A protein has these predicted regions:
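Acidic, proline/glycine-rich low-complexity IDRs
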Residues: 1-17, 94-136
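N-terminal leader/targeting segments
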Residues: 1-33, 37-41
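A diffuse structural propensity rather than consistent per-protein peaks
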Residues: 5, 47-48, 83-86
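Generic N-terminal initiation segments characterized by hydrophobic and/or small/turn-forming residues
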Residues: 9, 21, 30-34, 70, ...
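N-terminal trafficking/processing presequences and adjacent post-cleavage segments
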Residues: 25-77
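Amphipathic protein-protein interaction modules
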Residues: 56-115
Length: 136
């Protein structure tokens, strides 16, 4: 199966590419909100490290992966209303702690900045690691 260029990934996800620093980004609708897909560096013409089957599977299994990630977050943060957190990020090729990809949830503004919780997944779409807290 061939690798898709970033603009082809955006078409597959019915999204729109945009610049976000050193990352390639694409915004698309998911669950009535905006989901940002992003991957590290390169250019939109350079194929991502994943093939078309990966992207199609990711799109098809996203609702199930979202449920798995929320369960991890519920266990890690038992006092929080995880169901209310919007899934806003799907990050790929970030670094090893983020697995092959990670789902990111926007918890809102804090005194230190906007806080996101990321849940990493491996090549087999299995959970792989602890949640990651990231301030932006």
């Amino acid at each position: 199966m061939s690798k898709l260029r970033w603009n082809e990934v955006c078409v597959l996800w019915n999204g729109e590419a945009f610049d976000c620093g050193t990352r390639l980004c694409c915004k698309t609708a998911y669950a009535g909100l905006i989901l940002n897909l992003s991957r590290d560096g390169g250019s939109g013409e350079e194929p991502p490290s994943r093939d078309a089957l990966f992207w199609k599977r990711l799109k098809e299994e996203l609702p199930e992966l979202d449920l798995k990630a929320r369960e991890v977050l519920r266990n890690a943060f038992p006092g929080e209303n995880i169901a209310a957190l919007p899934l806003t990020e799907l990050a790929l090729d970030q670094d090893e702690s983020y697995g092959v990809f990670a789902l990111g949830y926007d918890t809102g503004e804090t005194l230190a900045g906007r806080l996101y919780l990321f849940v990493p997944f491996d090549e087999g779409f299995q959970l792989c690691g602890e949640p990651i807290c990231e301030l932006c």
